[in-house]
A protein has these predicted regions:
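Basic/aromatic-rich interaction segments and small domains that mediate binding to polyanionic partners
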Residues: 2-62
Length: 63
């Protein structure tokens, strides 16, 4: 996974429900985790959450 890839939460993460979509906005050194901006069906930001990549499913890879 890379910055700006579109992802979906595979599990509930803090206040983010499983299935919620988001965009990776930062990747930490070591590439095991990153910051993801999650948004609702109106594309409004819900929250920015630190996630392990194992908690995320890649929807669309940025090229």
């Amino acid at each position: 996974m890379k910055e700006f890839d579109l992802v979906k939460a595979k599990v509930d993460i803090e206040n983010i429900q499983m299935g919620t979509e988001g965009v990776i906005v930062h990747i930490y050194e070591g590439h095991a985790a990153g910051e993801v901006e999650f948004f609702d069906e109106n594309d409004d930001t819900i929250d920015v959450v630190t996630c392990k990549f194992e908690q995320l499913e890649l929807i669309n890879e940025r090229r």
